């Protein structure tokens, strides 16, 4: 039985400001979930915090590439150091974000160790890159593209380890059925995508078990689970920067996560995007914590 270690990665460097003169509030995610006693309820060990650099886009303008890139690069390396240490020790890191750019830290850490896959549970694939968009900037919407080697070198080739993820080792779950253009590109790259509709048709548990089994091959050392809170329907999880309709319901997400987290090949989990600034009563934080705790209940 591996030790679960809860580690904070409260970086908001990869999101655009919600309004002029403000910063994204998702950096408070870790504190909000800790207030819901996630560490105690998971019977987890304390992993501390990897403190991020200041959010400061300076004089960045559209066309300048990824904003906060230097800060994200340095933070990715420091976060990777911490995650790598726990993975090599046989722990199971649960990383509390933060925005989705923290996934780069996990991807880099695991690339140092070997060949790992990614099961990304997200409303959108976060696959924006210069080949499909002229609006590059927010790494929180680009981290899977960056992780697979698409984008600027100061983020895609840290330590000369490009790519951190192979296309064939990535799986997406919870993508909205309406995002046809995104799905078409991923299909052309043969990256499997399970939409919300697919999940309901085929069954979350069966899909997750098949995915975990697919990662249990001699060629792959394991996989990481990336959980973006916006995979949930806004009716139950409105506290995200880009709420998209027709998302997963809590029971569906638990059913998807359980077999993934229970797999001996699963190396860890990160939780991102939930914004306490949009959840003044803390109800969404309570729900998200309940989902994660329930998902580990049989793992």
Kindly give the residue locations of the regions a language model identified.
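Conserved alpha-helical scaffold segments that buttress catalytic/binding sites
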Residues: 2-299
């Amino acid at each position: 039985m591996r030790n679960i270690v809860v580690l904070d990665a409260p970086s908001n460097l990869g999101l655009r400001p919600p309004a002029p003169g403000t910063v994204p509030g998702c950096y408070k995610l870790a504190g909000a979930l800790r207030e819901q006693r996630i560490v105690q309820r998971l019977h987890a060990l304390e992993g501390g915090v990897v403190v991020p650099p200041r959010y400061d886009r300076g004089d960045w303008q559209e066309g300048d590439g990824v904003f906060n890139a230097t800060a994200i690069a340095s933070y990715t390396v420091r976060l990777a150091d911490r995650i790598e240490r726990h993975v090599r020790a046989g722990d199971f890191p649960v990383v509390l974000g933060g925005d989705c750019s923290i996934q780069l830290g996990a991807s880099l850490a695991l690339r140092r160790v070997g060949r790992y896959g990614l099961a990304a549970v997200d409303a959108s694939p976060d696959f924006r890159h210069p080949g499909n968009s002229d609006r590059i900037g927010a790494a929180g919407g680009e981290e899977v593209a960056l992780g697979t080697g698409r984008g600027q070198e100061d983020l895609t080739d840290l330590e000369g380890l490009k790519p951190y993820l192979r296309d064939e080792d990535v799986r997406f779950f919870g993508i909205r059925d309406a995002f046809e253009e995104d799905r078409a590109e991923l299909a052309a790259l043969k990256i499997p995508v399970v939409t919300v509709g697919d999940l309901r048709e085929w069954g979350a548990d069966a899909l997750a078990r098949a995915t975990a089994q697919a990662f249990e091959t001699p060629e792959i050392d394991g996989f990481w689970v990336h959980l973006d809170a916006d995979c949930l329907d806004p009716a139950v999880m409105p506290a995200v920067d880009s709420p998209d309709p027709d998302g997963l319901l809590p029971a569906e997400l638990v059913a998807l996560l359980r077999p993934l987290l229970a797999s001996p090949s699963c190396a860890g989990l990160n939780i991102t995007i939930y914004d306490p600034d949009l959840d003044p009563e803390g109800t969404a934080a309570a729900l998200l914590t309940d989902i994660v705790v329930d998902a580990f209940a049989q793992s």
